[in-house]
Design a protein with these regions (language model features):
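Structured mid-to-C-terminal alpha-helical surface segments
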Residues: 1-194
Length: 194
């Protein structure tokens, strides 16, 4: 259990290499402040099962996870919150920009954008459990959603993104490419004024 947050479980593991940006631990947020609706059951297969199949009697298992559409709106509202931040950007937040960039380039984007009720649910959840006047969650709706922070924060985000690239498998998109795609997504969502 996390000593500061009793609703989080920290699982530490031995690191096989040393990179300051990557902490050798996984944090599971399991308390009442985590929303599980909607969710689905998914079959997963770890990379280790591909490399060492002889070590796995059953290389696949099922996990229940929050839907990708909810994750899309969770990430969008995190970016909306950060777009209204007046102080310095927190560390390790560029991952949320990368995540939404990847989700926006997938079929998940179409189904998430078609479900504005889910956006309203995510906003209501954040207003109740993560209240913040400066986040302006009430404006996280088509017509006023902001995904891109002020220019002053973009340099901070780019530095953070440059540090986090060791976490990305495969092709690493340029930071400017991510921002351009997110500006397009912001325009697309804001064009859906209800």
């Amino acid at each position: 259990m996390d000593v500061i947050d009793p609703h989080s479980v920290n699982i530490s593991y031995p690191a096989s290499f040393s990179v300051d940006y990557i902490r050798p631990e996984v944090v599971l947020e399991i308390g009442p402040l985590a929303a599980w609706v909607p969710s689905a059951s998914h079959r997963i297969r770890p990379y280790a099962a591909e490399e060492f199949p002889q070590l796995f009697a059953e290389p696949e298992c099922r996990v229940i996870a929050t839907s990708a559409e909810r994750t899309f709106w969770e990430k969008a509202t995190i970016l909306h919150q950060q777009a209204h931040r007046t102080g310095p950007m927190p560390l390790r937040y560029s991952r949320h920009y990368y995540d939404l960039y990847k989700l926006a380039a997938s079929p998940v984007s179409t189904s998430a954008i078609a479900d504005l009720g889910l956006l309203r649910d995510v906003v209501a959840f954040k207003q109740r459990f993560y209240p913040s006047g400066w986040a302006r969650y009430e404006d996280a709706v088509p017509g006023s959603l902001k995904l891109i922070p002020a220019n002053a924060h973009l340099a901070e985000l780019q530095r953070d993104y440059n540090s986090m690239q060791v976490m990305i498998h495969g092709q690493i998109p340029d930071f400017d490419e991510i921002i351009i795609a997110l500006r397009h997504l912001e325009d697309q969502i804001n064009g859906l004024v209800e």
